[in-house]
């Protein structure tokens, strides 16, 4: 694995799982015909070892090896608390 892991920032939308969070990543995509920028959201499951995140927190997550069927990201830092 490279020493520069891919990182993303997003908002925690669920922390109901043990040691896991769901993060919503927003991006803007240009419409192919009309050219207007549209918001698109991706939901990613991430590993939160200490259960420190709450819903509404803005967090940074980094890519890691697969931890389960749906988790291959881990919490890097909490940017802002809700």
From Swiss-Prot:
Assigned keywords, A-Z: Ribonucleoprotein, Ribosomal protein, RNA-binding, rRNA-binding
The gene coding this protein: rpsQ
Described function: One of the primary rRNA binding proteins, it binds specifically to the 5'-end of 16S ribosomal RNA.
Family (UniProt): Belongs to the universal ribosomal protein uS17 family.
Name of the featured protein: Small ribosomal subunit protein uS17
GO terms of molecular function: rRNA binding; structural constituent of ribosome
A Pfam family per the record: Ribosomal_S17
GO terms classed as biological process: translation
Subunit structure and binding partners: Part of the 30S ribosomal subunit.
């Amino acid at each position: 694995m490279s020493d520069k892991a891919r990182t993303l920032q997003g908002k925690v939308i669920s922390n109901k799982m043990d040691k896991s969070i769901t993060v919503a990543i927003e991006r803007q995509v240009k419409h192919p015909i009309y050219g207007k920028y549209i918001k698109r959201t991706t939901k990613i499951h991430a590993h939160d070892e200490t259960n420190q995140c709450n819903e509404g927190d803005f967090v940074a997550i980094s890519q890691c090896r697969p931890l389960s069927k749906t988790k291959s990201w881990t919490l890097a830092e909490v940017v802002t608390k809700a």
